[in-house]
Amino acid sequence: MPFKTSPVFHIFDQQHQEAKLLFLALGKQVKSKKAIELQLKLEFLELFADLMEKIDFESQNQGNDLFSPFKSLKKALRKTHHLKLVEGNLKSREEDSGLLYDSYRAYLLVQKRKIQKEAFELAVGSSLKIWDDFREKALLASRGIKPLTINTAINQLVQEELESIHKELKSPIHSQGFRDLFESLRKIIMLENLLIQLGFNPIFVNSIHDEIAQLKENLKPWYSNHLAFQTLSGFLAEKTSISKKYMEWIKELKEEKKSLSSEIEKQAFSFLNKILV
């Protein structure tokens, strides 16, 4: 007997189709822009899998099972995204300082080729069957789900992220704490947008929603700085002697990270005080 397809599956299906096309393009040539687009699509598909797991209380590993074939690819694509941010930081440094960092640029090129090779091999080594299986399992998992059930599950996932932030975020916030905060905010925003797409009222009032989005946006410069500092430190660790221009740059990155961390920590705790009263 035919069954009614859940509205949440229609949203999943659109994202799935777009992700599959990007995956096919990746199997021909790895380009940073397409890789980042695919990473973002996979992040949504993973969130959908988490939502299905939350709804199906009898199968607590369902979400992991749904998305597990894509975890390695997502990890490789994230590396591509991170390197793109590091390259952008190098470009800005050269433009602002008028100096060239040729040896570091060559080092990044080697890293880029390794990362692209990893992503390419994962793409060409994977069967399209994993995409078809994912869609079929998602269709079955979403069958017969009532709108209220979806609404409740999304609210529960958002609450879990907020509780995680509240539990894990302690002053002073360390690098892992900032990364976890960014991930939690990213998930909360996607879940809120999904609620709205499904025709439900958002969880937060506009002012809080805007503050969440702004805090996530403000974390981007911190993340870029963190990756630049981490990568440059790795490069310099291989050197027996370090030139003045590199010493000055790493020092400035460290000072910038300290300043950004202090500012975002204030914003994060101000946000928590508003949201968890």
Predicted regions, residues:
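Function-determining surface determinants
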Residues: 1-277
